[in-house]
Curated annotation (Swiss-Prot):
The lineage of its organism: Bacteria, Bacillati, Chloroflexota, Chloroflexia, Chloroflexales. It is found in: Cytoplasm. Residues 121-143 have a biased composition (Low complexity). The gene is infB. Residues 22-102 have a biased composition (Gly residues). This is Translation initiation factor IF-2.
Length: 738
């Protein structure tokens, strides 16, 4: 007997062998029903839901009747006679509810009244019947052919749903969900999974995958030099030169830039080292010059190398009294590798033991022949302290710029390089970008490294708001979704959706690169652990005040890798050291380095409880020297900081002597007159010094405990505002063991 599905227009007679009705036999009657005109039963009589060729509605055959319907137009059920509900040919019985072919007997489940919402009960009441259900033979599911698995590698996007993954690979969704569950991933068919997870699952099924690269990536800038080389010469116009100042630590780089800009930036730098990257423009004779100032000394900073790549001219600062130093030589290497012209600025000519000729001879020995010695490298003698011959240096820069004819296309979509980035507590991600080609405008959609955004605000180094920035202009921008890396390329994108897709791909790659092993050690026991073969890698969590410092420190630490141990930064970020950072250090056995960054109280307590090693620095050279000595077993006794108390600045007022008195509330520990004080703003160190005065009311005191208020003057420092935090500490001598 062939299986078939009965439509609403098919005859009940034709389907009799396949369908059993809820009614009875041939008699009329209620649930039973013979041939009489019963209710839900159903022969050929005029019933509604029954269903032959009568005029039924949804169920019917060829007639126009209600749902079901026999050949006559009657009510539900019905045989041939006109009887009322009940059996036989008269009112009543018949063969009863379970009789004949239709009753509640053994094949009740095959009744057409058992499907969906259309049901007929034994009392003769009917409900709307929309679909006729067939026998088990008819209900057999249709055979579905399994999806064909592709041959060869398949391309998968950065993220996809389980359903999309199933369709792409030909693996059933249920199998994929089971495999994900075994891998520890609880998902549903609409859940998003990333490429790494999909590739692992695909490999379990013997399927090779490759990452899909969108066609839009073809227009993505990876090298700015390629962008400039691709410009039509007819579209190029002159632009200001971009100058980077390089040189040995304390040779006066920031002092020189300070003299050029006539500001006091140099006074705030720790140990003579520029800790923040800056980008500034100055003007001479109506022409602009852009200066980049990068952190630390060239020996250990990647930003110096990046600066040489984005710069047109390098001013190499050499002190007339110190001469050429190791970091001077490494700066020369950066310049030569970048292939940019160099100008030597011999600084500190006002020093008593200054000897410019000796400096020129040392430079010649290093392969830098100045013009006075018959070479092609200009040299200018200056005094940043006395601001002597500064204009002469600027004129030399403009002369070199004229010889090299620096140009860009101001009408192209903007492309530039990030020189500094940080997370501002009130403004969000803030980045300084040097526009190198095109014009950057407000409301431009941009792709910056692994993040995206829309330019909402833009201003120059003087704080003036701008609507656009032309080539060689440094600007601070707001509107990014995350903090980019120093050295990332900014590119204007026509479609923000495409930019986000590309940023997502880059984030995935960064996660892969950041993966590290979970073994680490404290700095004190580093050499001993290396000798015993306990570790092969030193895990570091790095927190700094700005993004540019992170890049500089990362490059510095990368120079310290040896065959015995590799340094691996498992996490980096800007701002306060948090409890999350400490928890990561606990799990990965890492040490935490705070560069001008301090822990919050919760993080400090967590670190003390679990013995997490947190080191604080404000000079990159000291940081690298400590780790280098630890790795070779040459650590000497140190003075370790012991934090004794914290206080919150509630108010400030100025004395007639111009000193600022900070009104404090001691929140933790105690303050003692002999302690050192560190002023923190938003978790970042802005001053480290000594206590000049400590008072309660008008009386000098030696100590103030937690829960009390006091007045305090910081020696030689007045930039204190309400909301700042003060940390009080002492130093104790500690013998290091290896």
């Amino acid at each position: 007997m062939n299986s078939m599905r009965i439509s609403g227009h098919q005859s009940a007679v034709d389907a009799r062998d396949h369908i059993e009705f809820a009614g009875g036999g041939r008699g009329p009657g209620n649930p039973g029903g013979g041939r009489g005109p019963g209710s839900p039963g159903g022969g050929r009589g005029p019933g509604s839901p029954g269903g032959g060729r009568g005029p039924g509605s949804p169920g019917g055959g060829r007639g126009p009747g209600s749902p079901g319907g026999g050949r006559g137009p009657g009510s539900p059920g019905g045989g041939r006679g006109p009887g009322s509900p009940g059996g036989g040919r008269g009112p009543g019985g018949g063969r009863g509810p379970s009789g004949g072919r239709g009753g509640d007997g053994r094949r009740r489940e095959e009744s057409p009244t058992d499907h969906e919402d259309g049901r007929i009960n034994r009392s003769g009441r009917s409900t709307s019947t929309t679909t006729t259900r067939t026998s088990s033979t008819l209900a057999r599911p249709t055979t579905v052919r399994a999806p064909v698995r592709p041959k060869g590698p398949i391309a998968l996007p950065v993220t996809m749903t389980v359903r999309e993954f199933s369709e792409a690979t030909g693996v059933g969704a249920a199998e994929i969900l089971k495999a994900l569950l075994k891998a520890g991933v609880v998902a549903n068919i609409n859940q998003q999974i990333d490429y790494e997870t999909a590739a692992v699952i695909a490999a379990d099924f013997g399927i090779e995958t490759v990452e899909y690269v969108p066609p839009q990536l073809e227009g993505i800038v990876e090298n700015i030099r390629d962008v400039l080389a691709a410009q039509d010469p007819k579209d190029l116009k002159p632009r200001p030169p971009v100058v980077t100042i390089m040189g040995h630590v304390d040779h006066g780089k920031t002092k020189l830039l300070d003299a050029i800009r006539s500001t006091r930036v140099a006074e705030s730098e720790a140990g003579g080292i520029t800790q923040h990257i800056g980008a500034y423009q100055v003007e001479l004779h109506g022409r602009k010059i852009t200066f980049l100032d990068t952190p630390g000394h060239e020996a250990f900073t990647a930003m110096r190398a990046r600066g040489a790549q984005v710069t047109d001219i390098v001013v190499l600062v050499v002190a007339a009294d110190d001469g050429v130093m190791p970091q001077t030589l490494e700066a020369i290497s950066h310049v030569k590798a970048a292939g940019v012209p160099m100008i030597v600025a011999i600084n500190k000519i006002d020093a008593p033991n200054a000897n410019p000729d000796r400096v020129r001879q040392q430079l010649a020995n290093a392969g830098v022949i100045v013009e006075q010695f018959g070479g092609d490298v200009p040299s200018v003698e200056v005094s940043a302290k006395l601001k002597k011959n500064i204009d002469g240096l600027l004129e030399m820069i403009l002369l070199v710029a004229d010889l090299n004819e620096y140009k860009a296309n101001p009408n192209a979509p903007a492309v530039g390089t990030i020189v500094e980035a940080e997370m501002d507590r009130t403004r969000g991600p803030v980045a300084t970008v040097l526009v190198q080609n095109g014009t950057l405008r407000l409301e431009d959609n941009v792709l910056v490294g692994a993040t995206t955004g829309t330019i909402r605000t833009m201003f120059n180094d003087a704080g003036k708001r701008l609507r656009f920035a032309e080539p060689a202009t440094p600007v601070v921008i707001l509107g990014l979704n995350d903090v980019p890396q120093a050295g990332d390329i900014l590119q204007v994108m026509p479609d923000l959706t495409v930019a986000r897709e590309i940023a997502l791909q880059r984030q995935r790659k960064q996660r892969l690169e950041a993966m590290a092993s979970t073994r680490g050690v404290s700095l004190d026991g580093l050499f001993s652990s290396i000798q015993q073969g306990k570790i092969k890698e030193l895990n570091i969590i790095l927190k700094a005040d700005v993004q540019g410092s992170i890049g500089a420190i990362e490059h510095a630490l990368s120079q310290l890798n040896t065959d015995e141990v590799q340094i691996r930064i498992i996490h980096r970020g800007t701002g306060t050291i948090t409890e999350s950072d400490v928890n990561l250090a606990i799990a990965s056995h890492a040490i935490i380095i705070g560069f001008n960054a301090r822990p919050d109280p919760a993080a400090r307590r967590q670190a003390e409880q679990y013995g997490v090693d947190i080191r604080f620095y404000n000079i990159i050279y000291q940081l690298t020297e400590d780790i280098k000595k630890a790795m070779i077993g040459m650590l000497e006794p140190e003075y370790r900081e012991v934090t004794e108390g914290f206080a919150e600045v509630r108010t400030t007022f100025r004395l007639p002597t111009r000193e600022i008195v900070a009104g404090l509330y001691v929140t933790e520990g105690k303050i003692t007159r002999q302690y050192n004080v560190r002023v923190l703003r938003n978790g970042v160190v802005i001053h480290d010094g000594k206590i000049a005065s400590l008072k309660r009311f008008k009386d000098d005191v030696r100590e103030v405990q937690a829960g009390y208020e006091c007045g305090l003057i910081v020696e030689g420092f007045n930039d204190i505002t309400p909301g700042d935090t003060m940390e009080f500490y002492r130093r104790e001598r500690v013998e290091r063991t290896v």
